[in-house]
Amino acid sequence: MSFANKQDPKTLVLFDVDGTLTPARLTISEEMKKTLEKLREKVVIGFVGGSDLSKQVEQLGPNVLNDFDYCFSENGLTAYKLGKELASQSFINWIGNEKYNKLVKFILRYLSDIDLPIRRGTFIEFRNGMINVSPIGRNASTQERNDYEKFDKQHHIRETMVEALKKEFPDFGLTYSIGGQISFDVFPTGWDKTYCLQHVEDEHFENIHFFGDKSYKGGNDYEIYNDPRTIGHAVNSPDDTIRILNETFKLQ
């Protein structure tokens, strides 16, 4: 057993990052760090996010691989256990360049034809296990992200674009998952956040808790939140996460 030092080594608590451990794209608070330190003495902890590890380091700190027992970047396609890297998967190897080029050409053409209040840079971000598509671009400032999120709720830009992609590529075997404030992920069906659970099977956890803020249908926490292997906790903010952790695990 890898976690014999814990009070309850058969319980794993997994967290989404944006909106759950940190405000969207911002850094972790001292209060959250202290809460997680207390929690880690009792149980096994990990995070699972769609971003790559470099962005998770920006948000959760440079010692992230040591601060969590499990670190799952890109939904677990890149994975670490106790600081050691586990086997990884590649989106481009799975889809192939021919299909990938068709997908990207359609996305860029679609984005050029829609009316948006602003455009910045990095509309398609290529990652190891997925692509991330942002109509206004990932280089938007925090204020621009907040403004766009309100605009998107009114005009359903991402939702409409996802439907257009599903219609254009019905046989590509892709899932489209809206997450964060300004973007959505595109990845092979089955490579959602439940993908990370295969990395923890060898520990035979009796309880796996998951905390996430996008647990509604179409949100990028939906599949793992509703998976029969997990106990789902829907949160509205990092403060909400701390409150539920204190109540559930008696941390105070």
Swiss-Prot record:
It comes from the Eukaryota. The gene is PMM1. It comes from Candida albicans (strain SC5314 / ATCC MYA-2876) (Yeast). Gene3D superfamilies: 3.30.1240.20, HAD superfamily/HAD-like. This is Phosphomannomutase. Mg(2+) 2 binds at residues 225, 227, 230. One of its GO terms (biological process) is protein N-linked glycosylation. It catalyses: alpha-D-mannose 1-phosphate = D-mannose 6-phosphate. One of its GO terms (molecular function) is phosphomannomutase activity. Pathway: Nucleotide-sugar biosynthesis; GDP-alpha-D-mannose biosynthesis; alpha-D-mannose 1-phosphate from D-fructose 6-phosphate: step 2/2. Involved in the synthesis of the GDP-mannose and dolichol-phosphate-mannose required for a number of critical mannosyl transfer reactions. GO terms for cellular component: cytosol; fungal biofilm matrix. It is found in: Cytoplasm.
